[in-house]
């Protein structure tokens, strides 16, 4: 599968990308929602999007809404470590705007792969 990973934290992106590549997935990375949306529009063969919710330039919720306008059926996994209001609140909002699944940071590689398996 081809998976787009959108997260402003390079260490989180690297962890996710390495986990996915070890399972023979193809990974495209973006450091914010603006870049992620651009890559999604350019690379039409993406199967799943994993996006952080709190990022500079364009937050994950806005990114999810815009992606849904382009492709209502693409699978989206929203991830969040929270911020001031706590990750649970952000993840509920992600669900409300169209994420197919949510995962609270920090998470293990095994938890990530289990979530992706549910999206397949």
PLM-predicted stretches and their roles:
Residues 6-7, 30, 49:
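Conserved sequence signature across two-component system core domains
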Residues 10-28, 97:
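Two-component/phosphorelay signaling modules centered on CheY-like receiver
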Residues 31-35, 59-63:
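Acidic catalytic/metal-coordinating carboxylates
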Residues 52:
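Active-site residues of response regulator receiver
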Residues 55:
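Receiver (REC) domain active-site loop signature in two-component systems and cognate sites
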Residues 62, 83-103, 110:
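Alpha4 helix (beta4-alpha4-beta5 surface) of REC/receiver domains from two-component response regulators
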Residues 79-81:
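Hydrophobic/aromatic residues positioned on beta-strands within the core alpha/beta folds
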Residues 111-120:
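Receiver (REC) domain switch/output surface
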């Amino acid at each position: 599968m081809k998976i787009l990973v959108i997260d402003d934290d390079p260490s989180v992106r690297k962890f996710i990308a390495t986990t996915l590549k070890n399972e023979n997935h193809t990974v495209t990375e973006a450091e914010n929602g603006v870049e992620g949306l651009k890559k999604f529009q350019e690379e039409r063969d993406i199967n799943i999007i994993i996006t952080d919710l709190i990022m500079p330039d364009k937050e994950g919720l806005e990114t999810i809404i815009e992606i849904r306008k382009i492709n209502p059926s693409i699978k989206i996994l929203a991830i969040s470590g929270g911020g001031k209001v706590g990750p649970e609140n952000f993840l509920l909002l992600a669900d409300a705007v169209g994420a197919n699944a949510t995962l609270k940071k920090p998470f293990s590689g095994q938890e990530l792969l289990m979530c992706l398996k549910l999206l397949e």
